Amino acid sequence: MPTAFEIDVPRRLVVCRCWGVLTSDELVSHYRALRSDPAFDPSFSQLADLREVTVFDVDTRVLGSRTLVATFAPTARRALVAPNDVGYALSYVYGRYTQSAEKNLQVFRAMREAEQWLGLRARGNDLGRAKDSAASPDSNP
């Protein structure tokens, strides 16, 4: 599965990363794994990095599923980074499903803008201790 996440408890931040071909099933599995992690707190901010996804094979109905929509609290600030048009459009649709009065989900084309919006310092692409939901640890590029 081409997904990984890191939960940075001191910064109250979840960094998610997807790459390669991303399917609906993989996206749902990713969110389930995140929710089941004991370090996860739904009020944490999220930085989702979709820059390395080459194909989005995601059904828009899945974007509105309870598994995805109810994972984070409505007050959690969430930044999705999707530079290509398909990823940006799907992220926008997902944002519409998770609508909150606070407008706490934003879609960006550049990582720097997303980090600034979340109030983070610039960081590299390495997730460090990311939890890889792939079948083998060697599948993470």
Label each region the model flagged.
Residues 1-141:
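Amphipathic, Lys/Arg-enriched alpha-helical "gate/interface" segment within cytosolic domains
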